[in-house]
Amino acid sequence: MTDAEETLLVGYRYDGHGDMVQTTDARGVSKHFEYGKGHLLTRLTNQGGMAFHWEYEGEGENARCVHTWGDGGVMEYFFEYAQGVTRTRNGEGAVSEYHYDSDRLIYKVVDANGGITRKQYNAYKELEVTVDPEGNCRKTEYNRYGLPSVITDANGNTTLLTYDGDCNLTRMKTPGGRVLAWDYDTMGRLTARTGPDGQKTRYGYEGKLLRTITDGQGRTYRLTFDDRYNLTLMEYPNGLFRRWSYDRRGRLAEEVDVKGNATRYGYDEADNLIRLEEPDGNTHRFEYDAMGNMVHAQDGIREVRFTYGALGVLKSREQERHRITFGYNSELQLKRIGNEAGEDYRFELDGLGQVTAETGFDGIRREYERDGAGNVVRVARPGGKWTRYEYDGEGNILRELQYDGEESLYTYDKDGLLVKAGNGECLTELVRDRKTGRVTEERQGGHSVRSEYDKEGNRTRVTSTLGADIRHAYDRDGYLQSMQAGEGWKASWMRDSAGLEMQRTCSGGITVRTERDRFGRETRKSVRSGSIERGAWKYEWGMADRLLSKENELTGTVMRYDYDRFDFLIRQETTKGSATDVIYRVPDFVGNLYGTPERKDRKYGAGGRLLEDAECIYHYDDEGNLVFREFRQPREDAVRHDRRRMEREYGIRRPVTDMGWIYEWTSGGMLRRVVRPDGRSVEFRYDALGRRTAKQYLGKVTRWVWDGNTPLHEWVAAVTDNDGREEASCPDGNSLTTWIFEEGTFVPAAKIRGDRQCSIVSDYMGTPVQMYDSEGNRIWDCTLDIYGKVTDFRGESLHDCPFRFQGQYEDVETGLYYNRFRYYDAEIGCYLNQDPIGLTRRLSVYGYVCNSNLLLDIVGWHGNSLDNIADSRLYEIKINGILFKYGIATEKYVTKIDITVVSPNGTSHIIPKGTPTRIKNQLRKAYANYDDVTFDSQPYKQISTFKMREIESKKIKAYVELTQKVPSGNVDHARRGYGVLADDFSGVHDLIKDLKMKNNLHISNDIH
């Protein structure tokens, strides 16, 4: 930028006393400051016109603030000062006390709930001991430089830290004995990082710039910068490139991905992004208010408007007259969510802002009792039901007890990794590698599954006590290259330079070829058995990854799809010859689905409960679980259920026909039993991780052994008594089915039963469409509609392959799809009970994903998009040498300019343009509050969100004891049902030990 091109970014104006009274940004919007005696700030009026005020006692250097507030009483605080103690009271009436000694070190904090936290310091004023209100004690020892050297957590486990002469952290040994190490050059720059598995990542510099990153397998990433130190090119180990270019102010102007697709950016004077042009031609435009909050967003498909309250809290989101509102208390803590139908979801908070009660859109109320550390120890549920929890000193759940005596117990190793999970059905034991914490053996009752890994952590072999022996091989870039089961079934993959599958070859002479467009989307998939084409599908795509049509080239069947402006898939038109069939999936304001465009074929209640359709009336219990699906008209093949019993046990009143499906639930929220219309029962059992272990029907029981989150073995045995005991604990070879999934995914690849080996072909969504035997014969062919319901099938038995949308297993006995933590009904397009993770994903707690052509719900938690593929980064932030946060970030959204942040000691830190937005947000907070902040990240090319979360999970677990608790930057995520402390064997980002609580808690404590 030349002098003639200079642009005013911020202007400052001062009064005659030297006090700054106004700042003006590049758009001409100003903040105003007013002062009292002694240069004391008394009023600040922000760009939106809202004012904040300060009142003081005393004058000059002795002046102290006694009252501060924003207009309308927002963020109001009163301060009282006494000898050795300061008291604060906020606008909600919550009072806290801070007691300090003669050195002005706080030694006791009395929080707003009356809990007392005590602190103890050494002679150098370093914090040595912290005891929380529950008596949990954490201790820290320091070296002569004041750096933590020994940290002992509340469970008594110790982490050891070692530093070099320049005070750089060089080694960390966790309580479980796992070791991480770091190397530095003479300038204090990180040159190598060694993980617990011994794999070393190296960093190379030229001058001041980082030029190369080389992983443990010798793969090198090369970085190029322009003369302004902007990253302009990244070369991947396989020769692919990503490019960035910038405007004259250093803002990102264009980004070109590895396939040559360009994304362009435009900005206003204040560097707000106002235009984004995607490679597919979709252009996004954005508008902002004076505070920099986005108030209007529009692209070629959607238009959304936002309004804001004090300090930028979101008050409403409106799209096509669909309005969601948010209400807050004076602390700006979320108290209410109003949905599009005018229903409210409300929260009650204690003095610390923790949720103590919540009332759903449907009026269901839950109350939460917490201990002094904030852990939920009791959930009071509707109908007098309750759940209790017990914890160790680090907040890990040890015991979950339900009101009916149902109990789950959990055990952890010294690093806080789950090693046992048991309930009345099954004990699961996880044997972990001492160095890495990876699960090497999982014992489930009398069976076990063992895993072996290569140096990169890729799983190379899976064996079981029931005879499974599955081997995986990977290519130079770490992508799955081949799988083999014993000496029989085999599959191999050929990929493009970005790692996307182009061809798969399976046993029986099966070849699956995939063609893609420049965005990596499938445009054609074909299946050949020998030289004969047995399957061929063609896909047409529109903007925003909307599938417009799918054609089965062999049958001539064409499916065309329509969408609304909310990204809902609303219509499927199927044409075959002269016949045309149309299926509707039309949502109302809150996402409830209808089968007609007029939306008069169904009736819904508050909170999205389906109450009636043309065939049935739906009855629910007091927790929102479906308990009776009653036929409107009597049926000859149905029995009448006992009306008194239904009212007594299920709370069903005024039934019409007494005929239909009855659903019974465990106290933990899992489906326990289904009574069919013919009076026969289907019963289910689960382990402590929510995995189904047994299904009993007509004197036979189906058993499963799991490999993490996917079933590995399945067999059927005869029941010999009323307790469901089987005639044999182990199946013979001919009755045992072994399922093989593509490693690290939920996509089935093969079925082995006895000597019969079958290859499974799936579409671009991972939904099985065909199956072939070892001779290359097509034995199973299935087509689903937009609800996931089977519309066309050819083969011996539909149940030969029971998998539908990813993560779903169809039960022929009930017609339901088991979806890990819930059951999905493809007839109506929704789940039987509410989402265990509540509002985390979406306000519709019964609904499936809005677009089944694009999104997945793998474990029954609404709208998982874990299969999305993108370039991503795993990052870590350390504060004062201690891990603050591990996280993942997609490189799809990055900063457009260099961002300068000044730390408390006045040091300026630059967050360079091109930094992923998620990383930018974390660094901005860290730099603004701490002087000693270090940052590092590792790129991953074209990787799924699922896999990135798995990698993140493993990293956090290896480091979890550094602060003797969850790293503070990860605490919020750990409280979510999809939290970052996933057991790495499970693959999904779920802390299962927390999930059992979330089944009742609905994690509302995380919403605000």
Question: What would you call each of these model-derived segments?
Answer:
Residues 216, 814-816, 843:
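Structural motif
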Residues 862-1008:
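Catalytic toxin/effector domains delivered as secreted proteins or via bacterial secretion systems
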Residues 589, 599-605, 750-820, 853-855:
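A motif-centric feature for acidic-aromatic and gly/ser/thr-rich catalytic loops and repeats
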Residues 1-603, 608-613, 617-620, 624-638, ...:
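Extended charged/polar low-complexity repeat regions
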Residues 760, 770, 804, 847, ...:
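Structural recognition of the beta-strand scaffold that forms the well-ordered cores
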Residues 629, 771, 789-791, 822-832, ...:
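Short, low-complexity export/processing leader segments characterized by acidic and small residues
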Residues 624-626, 692, 766-768, 784, ...:
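Cysteine-centered, disulfide-bonded loop motifs in secreted/extracellular proteins
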Residues 628-645, 719-723, 895-901:
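Internal, charge-rich low-complexity segments
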